[in-house]
Structure formats: structure tokens, C-alpha cells
């Protein structure tokens, strides 16, 4: 069997290292197969490179058959027997939520031993009220996402260089290891088609291999992180796998569209999408909401709420959902052409999240700003569009930004536009330049 290559992801690794040797428990969350386990290995490798010895590192992957089934007490005793005396021990627990009562054991490690703790989980249930009760104020969450476009190029063996352009700014050049030059847009199209799941760098970008790999991700998320998790919780909110699949397909097909549980139920009935299942009537709004929450807790979909820019408050209705990896969307719906505007919007949304922004939809009067991105004292208003070449498109994208009276940055990110320019104080930049910053 070919050994998986451990590739650097400095964006996340540096965030983890920043909390090394603090009492904060480092919690890495994100959809299954997005690279959390590799980050744990990279962190352990970093420790060894900086003088930490092997006996100071305990690594446990609870999805491995090599780790025996255990409850919280067995977990505690297993680790206690391996703690390094008179030196700090570094504890790495992968998919720790598989241990019933794990939070009791982890809290005891923190109290009883000189240790530095790192854990991962593929479901937001990991950070539920139970964890908050035991570890309130003592953990930091590192939210891990699939590869950015820049990481995608790196993982697939492409080299990005920049040189000054005679027309101003910088021109980006992408080559492979042999020096052959590739078109940036062509590679972006591959990213927008196949997505950024890290394992694709090992299996390649042939359509059959990609489909098989993404099928494995999807099945693992639905079975392990939704259906099985419901059993572990002792709750049975998610009882209809057919309905779950229909809701997944609806959300995937409607990324970037205003969505509610009511509208989903109506669409399922009106378009006859329930005919192949056992359910004969429209599911209750609460049922659909429970299914959506399960999908967001498994990190396959992310909800984004609307913010009234003038009223300065969040609105309760008509939020949107984006899918964590555009390759998963194409796997679910078929590798079809079209809808590139929403695909670009989806990609930009997750790029803003990667860069540490909190993101909302902006509402101003009866118009919409795609994203309000905030981070500490920084704020920017972002419009996303395929092209800024047509006058009517330019006016549509600029109009809501012109209405905003504060002095925060306002930008339009377009797949097709001239060199970076400014109009009415609004910066217009090319999407590929933004993604490769």
C-alpha cells in the first residue's frame, strides 16, 4: 500500500503552535478527511524537530483497530500508565468523541498531569455543552477546512511565482516540477470541479478516482458523523436516510440561495422528491430543521445569517447555506456545467473563513451584499460576481456598496475583470488574484 505523503499546511500548523505549551486544550474541528489527523502528525513532527523525545508523545487514533475499545476510566488508566515522569507529556487524541465520557478523562489529564493536549473531532457535538461544562475557557478551537486554491496548487505539485507586470501589479506564473507552464484559470477550473479534499493529491484528479474518494468521504460523514452519532446521543431525530439524502441534495443545489426549513419542505413535496421514500406526507418544519442541524454539526454545510446593515442587527429569516467542499457538491449533483456564479461565491466564502473572518450576508434596504467579513476591528464588505465587464452587472454589484456610509473597505471580487481598479472608492479585484494572495 502506498504511504500517504505528509504535506505541510502552515496556516493551521502556525495557529496550533501559537498555543503550544499553554493550558489551553487545542481542539481541531472540521469535516471528516479535511486534514485534521495530518495536522496532528505535523504537530508531533514539529515537537520532535524541536527536541521533544518520543517517550513524551502519546498518540491515539480512536478510529484505529490498534486502540482497544474503552470507556472514560479505561482511557484515563491507559494514558496514566504511559505518562512521562518529570517531563511534559504531549497528548494527541484523534476522533476522541468515540470514547463515551471522554471529556471527563481529558479534564482529569489536564488537572492531574503536566501535559499539553491536542484533540480532533468531526462533529460539532464535540464542542457541545458537555465539553463547555468541563473545559469552559480552557480550550481553543482550530477550525480546519479543505484546501484553499493556493494549497490545492501546492498539494498537486504546482509552483507559484510572481513577477512584476509591465502594465502594473504582479503577474502570477504557475509551473510544475519540470518547469512546464500552466494557465491559472485552467487550474482554477480543476479546483472548482474537483474541490480541495487533501486526499485527492494522493489519488489524482482522474474523474473515476475523484468520485470514489469523495464517495468515501460522503459515506463516512453520513454514516459515522450523523446516523451513528444519533445512536450514541440516545436520540433518534434522524430516522429517515432517504429524507436526509433529499435535504443534502437540495442544499447542495441551492448554495448561495435564501433558504428556510419551510421552503425545503414545500420544494420536496411540490417537485415530488419524496415519492421514492417511505414518507408519504410533508415532513414537519422541526424535522427538517433537525436534519439541517445534523448536517451543519457534521461540517458538511455551513449556515450564514443575514445582517441588517442600517439596523445593525442579525435577521432571523432567510439565511443561506454553503457546502464545505465544492468537489462534494459536484459529486452529489453530477459534474455539470453552469452555476459558476454560486460556485465562485461558495469558494470565496470559505476563503474568508480560512483567513479568520466571521462572515454574514449584508442587507441594505431591499438590496444584498454577498458578505460582511469581520475580524477584530477589521471589516470589509464583499460582492462576488462572475464578470464586471457588462455595464448593467457593474451597476448591480456596485449599487448596494455605494449605499453603505461607513468607511470600511468595500470590494468586488470578479472572475472576469480588468486589472485591479477602484470606482467610487470601491476596489474591484480579480478572483484569482484574491485567492492567490
Predicted regions and their residues:
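A cross-kingdom feature that marks ATP-driven nucleic-acid transaction machinery
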Residues: 2-5, 23, 29, 38, ...
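Pre-Walker A adenine-sensing motif
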Residues: 3-21
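Interdomain hinge/linker elements that couple catalytic modules in large macromolecular machines
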Residues: 6, 159-344, 350, 358
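Conserved glycine(s) of the Walker
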Residues: 35
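Short glycine-rich substrate-engagement loop in P-loop NTPases that contacts/grips substrate
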Residues: 58-87
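Conserved P-loop NTPase "ATPase switch" module shared by AAA+ and STAND
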Residues: 84-102
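Structural recognition of the conserved hydrophobic beta-strand(s) that form the central parallel beta-sheet
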Residues: 116-122, 143
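Short regulatory helix/loop adjacent to the ATP-binding pocket of P-loop NTPases
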Residues: 125-141, 153-158
Amino acid at each position: 500500500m502506498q504511504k500517504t505523503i505528509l504535506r505541510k499546511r502552515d496556516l493551521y500548523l502556525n495557529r496550533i503552535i501559537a498555543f503550544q505549551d499553554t493550558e489551553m486544550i487545542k481542539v481541531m474541528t472540521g469535516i471528516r478527511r479535511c486534514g485534521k489527523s495530518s495536522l496532528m502528525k505535523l504537530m508531533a513532527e514539529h515537537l520532535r524537530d524541536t527536541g521533544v523525545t518520543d517517550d513524551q508523545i502519546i498518540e491515539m487514533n480512536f478510529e484505529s483497530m490498534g486502540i482497544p475499545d474503552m470507556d472514560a476510566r479505561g482511557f484515563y488508566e491507559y494514558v496514566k500508565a504511559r505518562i512521562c515522569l518529570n517531563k511534559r507529556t504531549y497528548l494527541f487524541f484523534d476522533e476522541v468523541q468515540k470514547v463515551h465520557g471522554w471529556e471527563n478523562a481529558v479534564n482529569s489529564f489536564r488537572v492531574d498531569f503536566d501535559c499539553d493536549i491536542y484533540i480532533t473531532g468531526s462533529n460539532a457535538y464535540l464542542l457541545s455543552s458537555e465539553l463547555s461544562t468541563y473545559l469552559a475557557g480552557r480550550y481553543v478551537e482550530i477550525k480546519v477546512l479543505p484546501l484553499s486554491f493556493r494549497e490545492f496548487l501546492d498539494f498537486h505539485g504546482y509552483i507559484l511565482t510572481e513577477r512584476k507586470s509591465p502594465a502594473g501589479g504582479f503577474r502570477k506564473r504557475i509551473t510544475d516540477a519540470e518547469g512546464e507552464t500552466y494557465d491559472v484559470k485552467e487550474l482554477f477550473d480543476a479546483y472548482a470541479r474537483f474541490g480541495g479534499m487533501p486526499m485527492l493529491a494522493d489519488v489524482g484528479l482522474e474523474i473515476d478516482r475523484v468520485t470514489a474518494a469523495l464517495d468515501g468521504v460522503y459515506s463516512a460523514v453520513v454514516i459515522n458523523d450523523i446516523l451513528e452519532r444519533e445512536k450514541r446521543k440516545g436520540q433518534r431525530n434522524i430516522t429517515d436516510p432517504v429524507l436526509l439524502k433529499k435535504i443534502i441534495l437540495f442544499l447542495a443545489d441551492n448554495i448561495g440561495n435564501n433558504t428556510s426549513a419551510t421552503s425545503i419542505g414545500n420544494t420536496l413535496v411540490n417537485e415530488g422528491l419524496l415519492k421514492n421514500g417511505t414518507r408519504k406526507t410533508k415532513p414537519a418544519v422541526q424535522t427538517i430543521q433537525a436534519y439541517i442541524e445534523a448536517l451543519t454539526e457534521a461540517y458538511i454545510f455551513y449556515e450564514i445569517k443575514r445582517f441588517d446593515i442600517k439596523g445593525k442587527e442579525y435577521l432571523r429569516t432567510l439565511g443561506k447555506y454553503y457546502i464545505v467542499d465544492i468537489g462534494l457538491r459536484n459529486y452529489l449533483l453530477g459534474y455539470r456545467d453552469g452555476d459558476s456564479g454560486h460556485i465562485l461565491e461558495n469558494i470565496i466564502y470559505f476563503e474568508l473563513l480560512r483567513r479568520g473572518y466571521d462572515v454574514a450576508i449584508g442587507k441594505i434596504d431591499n438590496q444584498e451584499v454577498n458578505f460582511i467579513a469581520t475580524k477584530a476591528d477589521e471589516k470589509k464588505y464583499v460582492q462576488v460576481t462572475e464578470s464586471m465587464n457588462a455595464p448593467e452587472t457593474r451597476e448591480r454589484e456596485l449599487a448596494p456598496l455605494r449605499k453603505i456610509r461607513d468607511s470600511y473597505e468595500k470590494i468586488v471580487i470578479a472572475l472576469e475583470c480588468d486589472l485591479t481598479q477602484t470606482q467610487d472608492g470601491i476596489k474591484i479585484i480579480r478572483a484569482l488574484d484574491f485567492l492567490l494572495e
